[in-house]
Amino acid sequence: MPIHASLCFPGVCAVTALALATAPIATAQTAPAPETPQTTAGTITTTATTPQASVNAPDFQTRIKQMLSAAWLADLYPFTRDADISDEGYEAGLALALRCARMAPERRPAWDMVLLLADQVEGGTPDEARVARREALAALAKLDPFDDAVRLSRLADAIEAHPTADARVRAYEAILAPQNRAALGAPAAARLAYQLASLESRIGNTELFSRWLAEAVKADPSYPTAAQAAAGYFRMRVADPAADIELLSIAVEANPRDLSTWSALLSVLLDGGAFKSAERTARMAIAVAEAERRNELVYSFTGDLATALWGSGQRQEASHELDLRMNRLTEDYRRVISLMDPSITNERLAREFPPLPSTLSIAMLGIAQKDGDTKKFDLLLERALRGTDAEVKRAEDQGSSTADVGSFLLQRAVTLLLFGKDLSTVPKLLDDVVKSGALGDQGKARFDAMLAWRQGKADVALKALEPLRANDALAQYAYASALVDAKRTPEAITEFRTIAETHIGTSLGLLALDRLSDLLAQPKLVAPQLSKSIADRAEVLNTALAKHLPTTLDEIIDRPFRALTVEVKPSSTLIGPYESFTFGIRIRNSSRLPMAIGGDAPISGKVTMRSAAPRPGETDAAELPPQPLLIDRRLRLMPGEEILVTVDADLTVVGMLLNIQPLDSHLVSVSVVSNPSSASGGQAPGFLGSVTGAPPIQFTGVTVNEAWVKDSRALIRTAGSIEAVTRLALLIHAAADPALLPESIRGDAPAIWADIVAAWKAMPETAQAWILGVMPRDTPAMAPLVEAARSSTSTTVLRSWAITRVSDPTDSMLDVCRRSGDAELAKLADAVQWVADRRSKRAADEVGLETERARTMPKDTGAGSGR
């Protein structure tokens, strides 16, 4: 009996059938063990976006539609990403994207664009968005039956079609029934279980939310979203630090790139006095933060590392780590400053220090103070104070609130009160902090009392601090210190011990422990020596981390470039004008851990393509704009598995260069940045990422001579020939600038243009529209062709004009589009005019010449506005 026949409620069978009819992830359940020799069976290859089913080249109509689809998409991308595009603009863009996709259904980019724009218009036109989304998902499923993202989207789309939450819950439960799990595959089942958990949470079913969240983690522990959610949720319900370690270890293993999870794990370990494990964790967290270029977290984790070493009695190692890392961080900080202000002198630059978290400043100063190195202590104090000055200046430059600025002034005051020698500036600092709103009356009283303590007024300080110390660790530390000054040593020992026991793993707790060791004359006193319960708790946490956080993760972090193997290969390295080609991007999981693919995963769901090519007439390569490319066709890669994504080059910046400058010869270098760091804008690799180059690609270009022109004038008359269409486009580029024509035939330019116009008119409208989309900017020589194009009544040609050539909001062709009788085209014309108008105003505002521009710029009397 079929699986779906056993379901006893309506409306779900179709969803289950959809889940089971879609091809499962064959390799997800059969990944080889780490010690098993790898074979090519682990390869997961996506269906190429250029059809590969036939060895024959596409026929004329198929190929010209592919070319026109790509030409429209090339201009639709920037149009739909314009900052001022309206809701109607998104709707018009969706309609055009659907046309592009239907013209070339065997190519993926247009369908991806349909999905993107369907999400944008869903709020305003939900029915149209839903229909477009379903059509796109169905087409993508045919192109690549193993596309996990598409499979899940189709299932979610079918489930969301149910009218009630209860019906959607039953649909999820049917899909996730035990008999269906094998067909779904563990990664897909985990994500569906998480979606069901989220639905139960919205309904208010806490128990079922817990159940399905646990199911999601159980099905696929490498699914980062579920692992992180489980760590956050279940930690709130168990008062057990060892359980916290287990949950957070699963989340870290699922996504070591998530720095917030590292921070949470470190907090649990330090709070529990598990300094050995905290040291291991902090070193890994620093490596990830450095790779992700998150300097603010590098500072924070460096403070945690110093605290872990300090807490375990490794004072010398802590001092060494701080010196090593802070020197490097200071160099990086000064390098950035010198880039931002090239005029800065070396003397001024030497006085610049990075802003540091207060915990890191206290750790550095506390360790140096205990060591008795006065010179080093003074240097570190200056560094800490200059760092707070830098933080204040940054906050003021960014227009932060006065309270935010006040918080940084307060950090400076705390540093001075704990370690400073000259306290003359503290009263004014505290007054400024109060005025900023960052400090209330009770806080002001505490700091006034601390100032009295540092000024030698122990009795005054003790009287003011005594009622505050119960709930204020800093006040208690100052109170204990004042007790020492008042020669009340036994009471001071009690207070310092209390702070050390209740604030284990914090800079303040370790400062108190150092003071306690001095008072007890025990040179090396560590927290576990204070009580057996502290020692036992630390051992439990150390054991828990060793058990649940595998050493394979240490291996990955120590050698991140070995975890992912990336290869980039073009389909050809010799490309002629308007020739179609592809890039193959292969990524292999070479580690011993499964890795998810996605936006918040160990393997990013996108890579960045970087490319460079010399400008015409120059030899030095110029960087082309970086371009993100989606690769999230799979949910995860098991050890030894790889994914191969084929990308159509004509919609990359490299392919667009070929279209814009088809006559020129280019030697193009291409590389792919995997796991691009968000801190670098995606242009540099983050953790586990790399920059992988492809073999250089030679664009052959065209040598425009008399023989080539003669041959072209004959060839463009050939009917039903792609070569005739592309040669016509090349001839237009050559004839658009008379200087490009051989001197011997420049007198024939009118006849050449007559041939061009005749050939263009004789071509089918799809070819006409494509040529219109790839023509160069309008020149006087092009007037005959431009006039012929303007007189066309073909809606296909008019669409090409609207999306590829209009930059002037007053272009008369927009009215022609509106009068065409095609409502969809009229809507596109309105949207293009809106965006063109906003772009022209932005351009005027940027140079501050809007009024002058309106007064002096002549009206456009040319044949067309150009691209």
Annotate each language-model stretch with its function.
Residues 90-99, 127-143, 166-180, 206-217, ...:
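Alpha-helical repeat scaffolds
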